[in-house]
């Protein structure tokens, strides 16, 4: 240590961390009691700056490529040491936390941050255990040093900032970036690598449970409605983003929520609205002169966020766990306006659409994404976070669906009646009515209509939903144009799917090009 004047603050409470964050000028208190912090130029994830150390213990199991980029082991050691030296003469904040609400499948993690607000974020999003590391597992370490500037020529990084995961040494290094979401997503990637080896499917999904103990999962990319739809006043929340599905049940990987705030309203999202209070971290939310958050303001970024612990949600499952799911919902945001609002999937179709991960980048969480909306295919509804080959996760999904008998649905939260710019987006009440019917089991044995081009079965009637909306061709004025757009979408699916080596039963389960 340098001159001895620096301090290591260990396991501070929410109140202490907020107090220190304010005293250190890291953020401001808002009118609703939340702490608001700005992240500077990086207001989302930086996929180009994310690496995994290439080393013998994990190398053969990782799908190397543009998502999982290799980093040299000796370069990692040198950079880790440099960052530790950088922090040696600074105050740091440390907590002993866990990732995974499962006695068997948790990972203990020691989180060290340069900023108090980053430590508060970690304590909100990870699990603060009553007894740390009860099973005495080897401990992971995260270091987050936003003040450290990487030098690519010296450090081997892509830019002045980096996120590097080292499986052999159980270390995660974050340097040069303030966007706190990188911390949670790096540990999600860690669990996504570790869990399949134990027969557990890690999932980029939200989960809730009814009064009768029936679990529903919602898969989807950022902005498709995972957080909004799982925050259901009639049900109990397990979690909003990351879960594991083991034989016998599902468990939350996290201890908090990271909700998008853009256009947040008390009317449409009361559960999230009420969770934003003292102890919550608001990221890049603009406030007025009275410190009242303006959730419509996207001047800093579309990707404004609220990070709060699950304790801020009244209706939640206290143990962060649930039974295996009766219903599994794949949320897709279709910008072409072609997909129906809901379809029932066979297990082969479920594997096909899980591997495809078709959706749109709406208010994308990635750096450099503007408000422009484009369609994308993101494997397993979360390609940026899955280190193993996609087939590993698809196989596990089919296994779990089959052994429990879960029914899978494809729900379009995007456009109808025309593409983005011409058609209109399904409103939240319509999607909620569809989800209510799924959750109650009403759609399990309902009469369906077959859409040949899309190779999908759609219900002919759903309580509380205008039947005209159910078959998308009925919402388009120009039926010829609909057929053209449907053909184009089917071709896109087919072209994207060519990279997968899977049985014909899965290959043929997609749209008919």
From Swiss-Prot:
Primary residence: cytoplasm
Reaction catalysed by this enzyme: oxaloacetate + ATP = phosphoenolpyruvate + ADP + CO2
GO MF term set: ATP binding; metal ion binding; phosphoenolpyruvate carboxykinase (ATP) activity
Binding, substrate: 45, 179, 185, 305
EC nos: 4.1.1.49
Pathway in which this enzyme or protein is active: Carbohydrate biosynthesis; gluconeogenesis
BP-aspect Gene Ontology terms: gluconeogenesis
Name of a matching Pfam family: PEPCK_ATP
GO cellular component, one term: cytosol
Cofactor: Mn(2+)
Cofactor note: Binds 1 Mn(2+) ion per subunit.
The keyword Cell membrane is assigned to this record: no
Function: Involved in the gluconeogenesis. Catalyzes the conversion of oxaloacetate (OAA) to phosphoenolpyruvate (PEP) through direct phosphoryl transfer between the nucleoside triphosphate and OAA.
Name assigned to this protein: Phosphoenolpyruvate carboxykinase (ATP)
Organism the protein comes from: Shewanella pealeana (strain ATCC 700345 / ANG-SQ1)
High-level lineage: Bacteria, Pseudomonadati, Pseudomonadota, Gammaproteobacteria, Alteromonadales
């Amino acid at each position: 240590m340098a001159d001895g004047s620096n301090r290591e603050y260990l396991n501070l409470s929410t109140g202490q961390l907020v107090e220190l964050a304010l005293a250190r000028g890291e953020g401001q208190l808002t009118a609703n009691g939340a702490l608001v912090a700005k992240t500077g130029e990086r207001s989302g994830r930086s996929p180009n700056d994310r690496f995994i150390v290439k080393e013998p213990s994990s190398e053969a199991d990782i799908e190397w490529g543009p998502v999982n980029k290799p980093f040299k082991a000796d370069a990692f050691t040198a950079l880790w040491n440099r960052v530790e030296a950088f922090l040696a003469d600074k105050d740091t904040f440390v907590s002993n936390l866990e990732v995974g609400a499962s006695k068997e499948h948790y990972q203990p993690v020691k989180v060290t941050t340069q900023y108090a607000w980053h430590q508060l974020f970690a304590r909100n999003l990870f699990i603060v255990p009553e007894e740390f590391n009860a099973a005495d597992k080897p401990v992971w370490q995260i270091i987050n040093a936003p003040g450290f500037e990487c030098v690519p020529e010296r450090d081997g990084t892509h830019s002045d900032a980096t996120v590097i995961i080292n499986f052999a040494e159980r270390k995660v290094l974050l340097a040069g970036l303030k966007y706190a979401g990188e911390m949670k997503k790096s540990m999600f990637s860690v669990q996504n690598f570790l869990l399949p080896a134990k027969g557990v499917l890690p999932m980029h999904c939200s989960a809730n449970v009814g009064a009768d103990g029936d679990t529903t999962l919602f898969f989807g990319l950022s902005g498709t409605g995972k957080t909004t739809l799982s925050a259901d006043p009639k049900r109990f929340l397990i979690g909003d983003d990351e879960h594991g599905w083991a034989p016998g049940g599902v468990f939350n990987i996290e201890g908090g929520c990271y909700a998008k705030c853009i256009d947040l309203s008390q009317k449409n999202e009361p559960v999230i609205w009420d969770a934003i209070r003292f102890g919550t971290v608001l990221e890049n939310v603009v406030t007025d002169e009275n410190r009242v958050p303006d959730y419509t303001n996207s001047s800093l970024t579309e990707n404004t966020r609220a990070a709060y612990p699950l304790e801020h949600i009244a209706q939640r499952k206290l143990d962060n766990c649930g039974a295996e799911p009766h219903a599994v919902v794949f949320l897709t945001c279709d910008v072409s306006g072609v997909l129906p609002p809901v379809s029932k999937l066979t297990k082969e179709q479920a594997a096909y659409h899980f591997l495809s991960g078709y959706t749109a980048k709406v208010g994308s969480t990635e750096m450099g994404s503007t408000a422009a909306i484009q369609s994308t295919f993101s494997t397993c509804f979360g390609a940026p976070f899955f280190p193993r080959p996609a087939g590993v996760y698809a196989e596990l999904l089919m296994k779990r669906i089959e052994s429990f008998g879960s029914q899978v649905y494809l729900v379009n939260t995007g456009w109808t009646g025309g593409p983005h710019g011409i058609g209109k987006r399904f409103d939240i009440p319509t999607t909620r009515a569809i989800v209510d019917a799924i959750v109650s089991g009403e759609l399990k044995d309902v009469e369906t209509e077959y859409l040949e081009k899309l190779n999908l079965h759609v219900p002919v009637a759903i309580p509380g939903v205008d039947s005209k909306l159910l078959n998308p061709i009925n919402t388009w004025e120009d039926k010829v144009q609909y057929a053209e757009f449907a053909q184009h979408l089917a071709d896109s699916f087919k072209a994207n799917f060519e990279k997968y080596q899977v049985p014909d039963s899965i290959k043929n389960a997609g749209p008919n090009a």
